[in-house]
């Protein structure tokens, strides 16, 4: 399947872009992002964009978007505006952000040695570290695995 950016968005439902990364505005849009691309990861940052740690990770993701474009499509979700997944993924009031990986409609579990393999919810300051994580997740998914261990 050839990937077309935002091809799954209907003409009258354009999403605003935050420096090139689409912001998903509804549970339906999140579902479509997870389902859409069968050859790349869907990396979704669920979070509260007004909080500092979320801003830091958003900046990191924005800076890597084009470097990782062949492996991943990235999306942002404001969990205060779109709360469809807050209970499912256990996002609480004290959560600033959580980055989650999806592959062909499957949630990918990543072991970060934090005890929570569902999501990456700590700040990564090193671009190469995040690139390495995405590469490991992507390669694991291409091999048919739905879980992997972080290289860091």
Regions found by a protein language model. Name each.
Residues 1-42, 116-152:
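N-terminal leader/targeting and pre-domain segments
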Residues 14-15, 34-39, 53-56, 66-70, ...:
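Intrinsically disordered, low-complexity regulatory regions enriched in Ser/Pro/Gly/Thr
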Residues 23-26, 46-48, 52, 58, ...:
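Thiol-based oxidoreductase modules, predominantly thioredoxin-like and allied folds used
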Residues 31-35, 47, 55-58, 62-69, ...:
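Amphipathic alpha-helical interaction motifs in eukaryotic regulatory proteins
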Residues 61, 74, 84, 95-122:
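A short, hydrophobic beta-strand/beta-hairpin element that forms part of a small beta-sheet core
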Residues 71-74, 103-105, 127-130, 151-152:
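Short, surface-exposed, polar/charged, turn-prone segments marking secondary-structure boundaries
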Residues 78-83, 108-115, 132-140:
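Low-complexity, flexible helical/coil segments
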């Amino acid at each position: 399947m050839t990937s077309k950016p935002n091809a799954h968005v209907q003409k009258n439902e354009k999403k605003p872009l935050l420096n090139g990364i689409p912001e998903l505005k509804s549970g339906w849009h999140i579902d479509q992002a997870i389902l859409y691309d069968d050859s790349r990861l869907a990396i979704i940052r669920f979070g509260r964009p007004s909080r500092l740690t979320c801003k830091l990770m958003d900046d990191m993701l924005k800076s890597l978007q084009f470097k990782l474009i062949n492996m991943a499509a990235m999306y942002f979700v404001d969990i205060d505006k779109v709360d469809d997944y807050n209970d499912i993924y256990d996002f609480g009031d004290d959560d600033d952000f959580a980055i989650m990986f999806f592959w062909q409609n499957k949630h990918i579990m990543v072991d970060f040695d934090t005890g929570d393999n569902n999501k990456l919810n700590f700040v990564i300051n090193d671009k190469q570290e995040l690139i390495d994580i995405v590469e490991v997740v992507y390669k694991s998914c291409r091999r048919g695995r739905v879980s992997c261990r972080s290289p860091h």
